[in-house]
Regions:
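Alpha-helical transmembrane segments
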Residues: 1-15, 44-46, 50-53, 71-78, ...
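Membrane-interfacial loop-to-helix junctions in multi-pass inner-membrane proteins
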Residues: 1-4, 23-38
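Hydrophobic transmembrane alpha-helix segments characteristic of membrane transport
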Residues: 16-24
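Membrane-interface helix termini and inter-helical loops of multi-pass transporters
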Residues: 22-23, 54-67, 245-248
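Short, Lys/Arg-rich N-terminal segment immediately upstream of the first membrane anchor
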Residues: 26-29, 66-67, 215-216
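Internal, non-catalytic "lid/hinge" segments that mediate substrate recognition, gating
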Residues: 30, 38-57
Length: 248
């Protein structure tokens, strides 16, 4: 249950941001500093719960290497991965239906992995995520009638993290959430390159889905292509976990 509590806690941060934007009429919502502090507190609390749940001897599954003891790196690695993941999912919510569609493909691959290895609770958790996103997508596809805002995207980010950690294999996010990785990396690269070169850009706009949008791709094409790419990543993850000797 700690994963669900974590996702709800992250969603509350998103809700606070949306509330300030909509009700208080402050377009920027929470400041970056406020978001970072709040997210950091929630992430640390979640890591503590995971640490205690592992009997204070944290480990992580790595394909073909088995369960590897993490030691102090559990905290460093965990914080970086979780912080990056929840914000990368948030970045993906930039055009109608994109975040929901990509998260459905994420959920499908994680559901298969969990079911294949008889982790039925995690499989159910992923199934609920798929169902929720599919139901929301009815209203969120282009042209969207309903928007998830930071409340929804942060919750999805929290669930993505929770499911990966429920299988104790956060590294699998590199494949099952490859679009999240690309979106987050494109934003970091754009900002870094902009600062280093004093104004030059790698992409027309970041995150990268906006680059394709400005290159003439329709929103529907972006959603379709990104979802297919993430589904391919998910299929690769299923194969990797099957042949990589996955076991908790």
């Amino acid at each position: 249950y700690s994963g669900i509590i974590f996702a709800l806690s992250v969603a509350l941060i998103g809700f606070a941001d949306d509330y300030i934007k909509v009700v208080k009429k402050r377009n920027l919502g929470l400041t970056e500093k406020q978001k970072t502090i709040l997210q950091s507190l929630v992430i640390i609390a979640y890591l503590v719960s995971l640490y205690m749940g592992m009997g204070k001897e944290p480990y992580m599954f790595i394909p073909f290497a088995g369960n590897v003891r993490m030691g102090v790196f559990f905290w460093i690695f965990g914080f970086v991965v979780i912080y990056a993941a929840i914000n990368a999912v948030n970045f993906t919510d930039g055009i109608d239906g994109l975040c929901s569609s990509v998260t459905i493909t994420f959920g499908l691959s994680m559901c298969v992995i969990a079911y294949m290895h008889k982790f039925f609770g995690v499989s159910l958790m992923a199934s609920v995520l798929i169902g929720g996103c599919a139901g929301f997508l009815v209203w969120n596809h282009n042209p969207a009638k309903v928007f998830m805002g930071d409340t929804g995207s942060m919750f999805l980010g929290g669930m993505v993290v929770a499911i990966a950690y429920a299988l104790n294999c956060p590294l699998i996010l590199l494949l099952t959430g490859i679009i999240y990785v690309i979106e987050g990396a494109s934003d970091v690269l754009q900002i870094g390159y902009f600062k280093i070169t004093h104004g030059k850009r790698i992409f027309k706009m970041a995150p990268i889905h906006h680059h394709f949008e400005m290159s003439g791709w329709s929103e529907k094409k972006i959603v379709a292509v990104f979802s297919i790419v993430n589904a391919v990543g998910g299929a690769a993850a299923i194969a990797l976990m099957y042949f990589g000797g996955y076991a908790l």
